[in-house]
Amino acid sequence: MAKRVCVGDLRKLAGSVSTPSRCILPPHARCFSVLNRPPPNYEGHIPLTVIERLGLAVGSGLGSFLDPRRADLIASFGEATAQPHFIYKLRDRMLLNPTGRRILRDRPRLTSTSLDIPRLRQLPPNTLGYVYALWLDREGVSPDTRATVQYIDDEECAYVMQRYRECHDFYHALVGLPVFREGEVALKAFEFANTGLPMTGLAVFSAFTLKKAEWRRFWDIYGPWATRNGAQSDDVINIYWEEELETDIDQLRTRLGIEKPPDLREMRKAEREAQKKDKEAKETMTRAAV
């Protein structure tokens, strides 16, 4: 005899059968999408999917290659390509160094206020602090213009990227390279050999956009200098710049194993003067021949 089934039993039976086409997620699970992002890991953090990170890397990389003056694109490309491997490796190198560990623990920030730029201008002429302040004044730049890190997922690694970014002007002052393109390419080559960050490597490729004379100087002088010194010197990310401001800059270079390259501004000036004299000589010969 068939068993009688009431309507309530049918409803219970239907509710106990899962529908194959639907995937039931745990209550705490969240889909990662542009419209439904997981919470940020720190203030200002913007999580990215793999596709978004790839798009950011390609777009900002091409843009910064075509226009190296776009600091925002350079910063975005640096963050998009630094993880998952390179920024962690740089962080690990800091953890292996006593000074690097102190920097990670203290988390200092390099700003015009924290550095007290007016005080640095009063230091003895050959100190790092004085040379740094003089370099800022000559190049017309400020330590307060560095963008805040947004796309690095790990909070500690985000600080490492921020620290690298804020230390960039100290690298300029330490080796005496200016901020125009030729100087930036040389410094980025030094940074690539020292830090291994992909963004610095891409910047080296912009050497192909240099003028003929600039390319010749980079190939003959500044490229070899950058590769040699970046590879052989101490990790510049592990320098506690705030504690070296009153250090003699020549002694600091010696301690770090960094040779100061030829003065790029003086070389460019000498080349312009030579071109001017050559032009005047040709004009004189032309007038004499007439």
UniProtKB/Swiss-Prot annotation:
Binding residues for Zn(2+): 168-169, 172, 184
Its membrane topology: Peripheral membrane protein
Top-tier EC class: lyase
EC number, UniProt record: 4.1.1.130
Single GO biological process annotation from the record: ubiquinone biosynthetic process
Pathway(s) it belongs to: Cofactor biosynthesis; ubiquinone biosynthesis
Subcellular location(s) per record: Mitochondrion inner membrane
Annotated organelle transit peptide span: 1-32
Subunit annotation: Component of a multi-subunit COQ enzyme complex, composed of at least COQ3, COQ4, COQ5, COQ6, COQ7 and COQ9.
Purpose: Lyase that catalyzes the C1-decarboxylation of 4-hydroxy-3-methoxy-5-(all-trans-polyprenyl)benzoic acid into 2-methoxy-6-(all-trans-polyprenyl)phenol during ubiquinone biosynthesis.
Protein family: Belongs to the COQ4 family.
Name used for this protein in its record: Ubiquinone biosynthesis protein COQ4, mitochondrial
Organism: Phaeosphaeria nodorum (strain SN15 / ATCC MYA-4574 / FGSC 10173) (Glume blotch fungus)
Organism phylogeny: Eukaryota, Fungi, Dikarya, Ascomycota, Pezizomycotina
Gene expressing this chain: COQ4
